[in-house]
Amino acid sequence: MKWGLATAGLPIVAHSLTASGEGISTAAKNSEPGGSIVALPSGAQVFYREDWLGAPWLDGEPVLFLHGNLETSEVWYGWVPRMAQRFRLYRPDLPGFGRSKVPANFEWSLANYTKTAADFLDAVGVASAHIIGAKTGGAIAMQFAATYPQRTRTLVVASGPFSSVDPKTENTSQQVRLGSAATKEEMAYFDKLRDATSPETRRGIGGIISTINLDNLLPKITARTLIITSDRSALQSVETVLRYQPKIPNSRLLVLTSDAYHVAVANADECVTNVLGFIQDAKMPG
């Protein structure tokens, strides 16, 4: 069961340089088990996974996934089987997470992560993409869409914060993050991802999320936007989301029936169904 809200807050029924958006990359790519690594101008080394399950003679429209705090690009596993049949997926480990490295002088700011996302698209030869972000990655995605409107085909934000978040939320139990349906094995896996996050990254990201303020940027987002949250999110209430979402032109809100706040994982299949429909609708004129 789910319900959605249009821009004005009224209930609704939930539902490049080349043709594919590819540019020409001049960045050196190094193959890694399970993916590749590209070097960005900032000095960051970004590991990423590229997924395409469509016909080999076709080239799907690009989608850029931006994960949240205390995790890696692996968390999009529930999105890949269906999304990659229609889109070419780029799933980077954000700098400081997983197999991606930050340079010694890395600037821990939302603006720098936004620039990093743009530099990554340059490195893989993508001029524009559908941008999908979860949790802190959702905040990066919103700032990206406001900063690079010409590079944003559509925007999807799954449980992304619009304003500051207490860094202590990193100590929240996986049961709260993933919901009551999460298994012990699933929670143990996410504990492992959390524990693998370096103290430097935790401090840096903690400083970012404690100062998030997207209020003035939201009206600058011109891409069609889908905001996804849950009706019992411990991260932010539906009422909180409703104070911000209508400020994004051409946006809609989808509220899922769930007690998890990491809906991109806990409600992955439902998210994918709605995102596929949303992107299809966004391509329609009007």
Each language-model region and where it sits:
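Conserved HGGG/HGGXW glycine-rich cap/lid loop of the alpha/beta-hydrolase fold
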Residues: 44-99
